[in-house]
Amino acid sequence: MRTAFRALSTFCLISSCSLSVLAQQRSAGDQPSQIRYLPPTSQTYLRFASETDSMLHRDVLDVWFPRTVDNENGGFYSMFSRDWKPEPSQGKFSVFQGRMTWVAAQVAIHHPELKDQFLPIAEHGVDYLNNVLWDKKFGGFFWGLNDHGAITDSFTDRKEMYGESFALYGAAAAYEATHDPKALALAQSEFRWMEAHAHDNKNGGYFEILTREGEPIQAERIDPAKPQKPEGGFPAGYKSMNTHIHLLESISQLYEIWKDDAVRKRLEEMLAIVRDKICVEPGVMNLYFTNDWRPIPDHDSYGHDVETAYLMLEAEDVLGVPHDPKTERMAKMLVDHALAYGWDEKLGGFYEHGTTFGEVEDIRKEWWVEMEGLNALLLMHEKYGRQSDIYFNAFQQQWNFIKTYQADPEFHGIYPMVGPDGIAAEQNKGQNWKAAYHDGRALMNVSERLKRLAGNWQSVQLHSSAGTD
């Protein structure tokens, strides 16, 4: 059935028939026996909201905080074993530091009962970003430093826009939570540094790898005798999907707190680049590009597809232009394609990656992919649930997968990687690339959206009852 569906989906995913074809794929014979799908009612929404709230506390907030706070060296400590014991340090990485600052700020904003606990943690994160990670001599944030704030051979002294983006993200969120002028000034300084040094005024977007002084590093001719995998996966002299979707994310966060015309212009540019250059029919994304935006062949990342659907829709809301047809259409195509090609019919969950129309190449399940998938599926249900139950049913199966296989029932927290049999393939709970960001954001977003859906459902029911009197 999957092969036949794929041939048909090539023609259908970009049209209105995508939902009906997806429904055909979810025939009775394909349904996992352990799932009993619940109808989208207020009671159902509130039940799932309660469950996601419980996981947010048990498997994210209670295990990460305050043990991640480094009171000796500043910032946040990243390395933890399965049972949450500290492991040898990887240093202080800009991505991890920005993400943990953002999480603490968002908890303080969205959970008033926890504000007294998390506001000081957000302030702690900003202090590290401002006092240590920010380059006092040349501006911009270091890609990473050792625990004592010194430049290392592994991180080098370079600046990478992926890290710049998350440091900006954390500083902007911290200002929203704390109203500390220092956090706003840091976010503004970073944006101005990005504009002066990294923005590509000719082709749009940003140069991604820069020297400490802020000069873009150009691509080097490949030497077959010395193949090199770039640190972090970002090759110098090229542009990437991954960096630019997170620049869209961080500039969205910045524009929420600073309604500056230059920030709005850049946010509009980032949304157009992600939607119109990086995303392509039938709902996939190119991963790498030359500086003038010519795509470089690579695989399709299902997790980035569903995450980008959410980030584009978030950006249009921040810009005050919700329901833009081009953005909505592309966001839906990304999720539909991931469901069609990257979805595990048996256990639920999105696979790691594959090709646009071919077989899945990596059938493992990574924590951030599953959490972003949960968030995107409920968002699609909110927008298109009246047309089909596909998204809400997939949301329920996704949630069942996360509860059953991704969460650790003994020591709590989320396993980083699960194999095709549902058994944890990796068990460490923290490292520089695994913060509380993807799972924390997804669970907070999903809980809030479920409660909103429950309220809307009740309003519709009351309105319908009043109309029949």
Language-model segments: which ranges?
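Bacterial N-terminal signal peptides that target proteins for export
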Residues: 1-11
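Bacterial N-terminal signal peptides
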Residues: 9-20
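Glycan-recognition and catalytic cores of secretory/periplasmic carbohydrate-active enzymes
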Residues: 24-469
